[in-house]
Amino acid sequence: MKKSKLVVALAAILSCAAIPTTVMAESNVQQTMEKSNMSEAKKDLHEIYLAGGCFWGIEAYMERIYGVEDAISGYANGKSDKTNYQKIGITDHAETVKVTYDRNKVSLDKLLKYYFQVIDPTSVNKQGNDRGRQYRTGIYYQDTADKSIIEKEITALQGKYKNKIQIEVEPLHNYIVAEEYHQDYLKKNPNGYCHIDLEQANYVIIDEKDYPKPSDAELKAKLTPLQYSVTQNKNTEHSFSNEYWDNFKPGIYVDVTTGEPLFSSKDKFESGCGWPSFTKPITKEVVTYQDDHSFNMLRTEVISRSGKAHLGHVFDDGPKDKGGLRYCINSAAVKFIPLEDMVKENYGYLTNAVKE
């Protein structure tokens, strides 16, 4: 996948322009180019090399991840600095995708979590229907600082499996870009072979560590008395007079205590109860549950994962065609981030969770 540069496009436009160049035009172009350069400067590009079976699928999958700038199929960590598709069995290279990503948008540990979703990490020299050493799994790095991050994620992954994790972790060597035929193969051949489900890229990973819980003193300084009372003391605000009960603008609702994303406007509906109501959280992991026996009733309390904040309750009287649940949430427990502000507020990776 190759990215075009705005600066190049602007230069082409200027060279073809038939209008006279004025001071104002020059000023406008200069400002545009400066903004473009600033945008480029804000990027923190980094590379990691991922082997996970046939590189057609891994390349197409990684290109769909928010924050990935480029993905190129190639061959890595073989015995020689020359090879090709016909010789990789002899040179012992692994089919590997060079992933260039913006660390301001996606961290390496999160990128690896996406990678783990589409491989069998305990399999040796086999992924999907593909067999052979060239289909082994591997994470190859150039920056030595990446090694500890990779090893930490591998250790966490091992805790989920009984069998030993077989992912090769090594410094990168002998990387060779694959033939043009293999680049963007699934774009050129939409019905071509792919051993993974590319739709898994749409499952958003929300990392709890990105949204740490503040201390109680910090919460008291940060929250309004109502927000603190609701989230920390499990109180309930008044219906029909709270901030978001009738808000149906596109955006997300985040934990007011930590900023962790919780709900999407796409899943919000008018329930008639007077509080914001949702059919589900953005992902199932961002909330937890416990029985609530207060007021001589048995209800299921909804609690934010990272902040451990009281959010509200979940009931089974929601829309049947959307799962039948109604998450009844206090406005005071959440903060609304409009769709147009999500990138600016570092929630750009969730825009697809909002758009219909």
Swiss-Prot record:
Record region (Peptide methionine sulfoxide reductase A): 46-199
Keyword terms, alphabetized: Multifunctional enzyme, Oxidoreductase
Annotated MsrB domain residues: 216-339
Span of the signal peptide: none
Pfam families for this protein: PMSR (PF01625), SelR (PF01641)
Entry-linked InterPro entries: Met_Sox_Rdtase_MsrA_dom, Met_Sox_Rdtase_MsrA_sf, Met_Sox_Rdtase_MsrB, Met_Sox_Rdtase_MsrB_dom, Mss4-like_sf
Reaction(s) catalysed by this chain's protein: L-methionyl-[protein] + [thioredoxin]-disulfide + H2O = L-methionyl-(S)-S-oxide-[protein] + [thioredoxin]-dithiol; [thioredoxin]-disulfide + L-methionine + H2O = L-methionine (S)-S-oxide + [thioredoxin]-dithiol; L-methionyl-[protein] + [thioredoxin]-disulfide + H2O = L-methionyl-(R)-S-oxide-[protein] + [thioredoxin]-dithiol
GO cellular component: cytoplasm
Active site: C54, C328
The EC number(s) this enzyme carries: 1.8.4.11, 1.8.4.12
An individual GO BP term: response to oxidative stress
Domain of life: Bacteria
A GO term for molecular function: peptide-methionine (S)-S-oxide reductase activity
Family that this chain belongs to: In the N-terminal section; belongs to the MsrA Met sulfoxide reductase family. In the C-terminal section; belongs to the MsrB Met sulfoxide reductase family.
Functional description taken from the UniProt entry: Has an important function as a repair enzyme for proteins that have been inactivated by oxidation. Catalyzes the reversible oxidation-reduction of methionine sulfoxide in proteins to methionine.
PANTHER family membership: METHIONINE SULFOXIDE REDUCTASE (PTHR10173), PEPTIDE METHIONINE SULFOXIDE REDUCTASE MSRA_MSRB (PTHR10173:SF59)
HAMAP family for this protein: MsrA, MsrB
Name of the featured protein: Peptide methionine sulfoxide reductase MsrA/MsrB
Provenance organism: Aggregatibacter actinomycetemcomitans
